[in-house]
Amino acid sequence: MRSKLPLLSALSVGAFVLACQTYDFEPVEPLAIAQTTVEEVIDARRSKPNIMLLVDTSASMTDPVDPSNPACMVDHQGSRTLCGREVPCSVDVCPTRWTELQAAVPQFLESSGQFVRFALTTYPETRGGTGAVDSCREASQSTLLKGLPEQEDDASLLAHASEINDLLQGIPNSGEGRPLGGTPTSGSLNFVSGLPGLQDPGRENFVILLTDGLPNCNQANVNTGANPELCKCTIDNNGCFSSYLTRGCLDADASVVAVQALKQKQISTIVIGFGAETASGEGPAVLEAMARAGGFRRTCSAERPCGEGDTCNPTTGQCNRSFFQAGNQGELARALEDISLAVKIPEPCLIRLDGPQRPTDPKLLVVYVEGERTPSSDSTWTLNDDGVLFTGQICERILASTPEAPVKIELRAIRQR
């Protein structure tokens, strides 16, 4: 027994030492993992989308795009006044909303023309008159300046888009044929809603509403100038009386209803506000309500922010503002470019991944083609700044796909944060 005592003593001491040890643990932040699954059934021969350009040609479009520009002050009847509706601006030194629109549109139509079936409607239909009835006449067949194209090959579509650009460039900033009248938005939306060509179930259908003012001109408006708080008069100097008793009141509700009616017909409305009136006062709330009803969601990323006065939601990858707001030619061109990227049929062999859809590491992306896991390589697919680009035989399969024989592709991307 004595021979074992040292061993027992050693064990006792060892146990005591172990019992007295202490450990320091460093806090570790839990790993948050999110997975995004993107499923695409690709048909390379999808029909090209229809887009109706509904362009506001009201009198305010001839106002300066930058009223603070000293060159926009002109002599008129013995005093200095801001050029615009009453006195034409010298557009070389004082660009107007209309001339800025004319400068922004060509690139949009040229870059999108072969991918999109465009049409053009302007409003109001003043017929050159300046009275209340003429100023508030909504769009009609007479202001449907260019219908949807009959041919769909790239060259024909590009020529069609070029003709639409020529029509817009042909509307002068001053003189006969210049922008005149009010902003009968709800009635004009109702007109394009009734066009059979925009109700094509085999295509995506869009209306791009480009307006610089608050909607008005609704003679059936339930509000009147007799109640200024409810009327929210859109006429200068609170001019909602006589012929403008109802026509001059803000026509927000009917405009939203008109957009909802379009959406019920599977026609999405994209709203662009252009100028100071849509950026302040009642403007943002009205355009936001219309844009939300229109169903078009503005996507964004660090590379493609939402623009001045707006932010990108990193969780959804969408802008917090649903409508586009542009204050000058550059901002309008950017809005049109974003729309072009969103609506035209993309490169068939590219599946875009935006914002939160992208993995935090390329190794955390898994691709399935027709249910079969497909590793990345130069002959299968690669991840680039735009998304997943397919090459080789997979791209050939995509290009040969038809509505009857599409290609099913599934992307699973993991984000660690």
Give residue spans per PLM region.
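P/S/T/G-enriched low-complexity
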Residues: 20-417
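Sec-dependent bacterial lipoprotein signal peptides
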Residues: 1-18
